[in-house]
Amino acid sequence: MGMQTYGNPDVEYGWWAGNSRLAGFSGKWLAAHVAQAALIVFWAGAICLFEVARYTADVPLGEQNLILIPHMASLGLGIGEGGQIVDTFPYFAVGVVHLVSSAVIGAGGLYHSLRGPAILKEGPARAPKFDFDWGDGKRLGFILGHHLILLGLGALFLVLWAVFFGIYDPVIGEVRTVTSPTLNPFTIFGYQTHFVETNTLEDLIGGHVYVAIIEISGGLWHIFCPPFKWAQRLIIYSGEGLLAYALGGLAIMGFTAAVYCAFNTLAYPVEFYGPPLDFRFSFAPYFIDTADLPSGQYTARAWLCNVHFFLAFFVLQGHLWHALRTLGFDFKRIPAALGSLSEDVVDAKA
């Protein structure tokens, strides 16, 4: 089963169609995703080194149009008292590690593209376990489970980093360890309606403890348990359907990140990102700086927030597009429908 859910099942996709060309080849699909991961890691490393070269101690960090150094600073790297950057070598090291990692991951992408099996079912060892068909909910759940576990481990890594190495606390202006994360579920889940107001590192890290538990538990569940009957009836198992679900989730995360970045000063300290933003609405919603800056200059917070917001907006349009196509709506019929409608109007006037 390919990406489409209706029409011609044997569509010939052009190069611009991206991964749609590989929908029937699980090995090539894996190669594309590994290569894309390499590009992401390469971007992180290259931009990190670029920012290190541009950084100056004479201008507030939030006003230097940097987006990666503030993130690393909030993790406590290179930070002294009062949130001052005292050492940029950790940022350089992080950039180099990412560049080297991107080469290793890229080599994996090349291997799976040039030497690995086009279909994982034909591969050696455990490779066939990751072969999939778009209509096989059990196998797709198995693969989803591994993704969820990796996400959970990422959240757990942040928790361990905060507990053993410490992160920057804007309340006291110092890097400190979080030895007692909040584990009270009523406190953590009480933030659901006002999560932007998280104001202690204990609550922030405690929330990541729950995220790690939920992600890893959910991953194990999906690995060992096939979808329930009611879930199979609700979910449309097709390449385009799953793409629509993924884009919808990505849009939600983008909007959430934008709002959190705009207004929360615990995870996004003023020292590194600039002051909180104001929300405005003109032709489209947007966030503006409250800091007094020269014309055409913006804080790191404004850049991060607005980029996340507008990317989430367009990703949401992609979700709606693919969801409608999944349900059988053919956008190619719209011009014909509009043409017949205009002809009816002309005939009525005649």
Curated annotation (Swiss-Prot):
Membrane topology (UniProt): Multi-pass membrane protein
Cofactor note: Chlorophyll a.
One GO term describing the cellular component: plasma membrane-derived thylakoid membrane
Keyword Thylakoid on entry: yes
Domain of life: Bacteria
InterPro entries: PS_antenna-like (IPR000932), PS_II_antenna-like_sf (IPR036001)
Transmembrane segments annotated in the record for this chain: 30-50, 66-86, 91-111, 204-224, 243-263, 304-324
Subcellular compartments: Cellular thylakoid membrane
Keyword DNA damage: no
Note: PubMed:8986795 speculates that the protein is probably 2 residues longer than sequenced.
Function: The antenna complex functions as a light receptor, it captures and delivers excitation energy to photosystem II (PSII). The Prochlorales pcb genes are not related to higher plant LHCs.
Protein name: Chlorophyll a/b light-harvesting protein Pcb
Gene source species: Prochloron didemni
Taxon lineage: Bacteria, Bacillati, Cyanobacteriota, Cyanophyceae, Synechococcales
Gene name, Swiss-Prot/TrEMBL: pcb
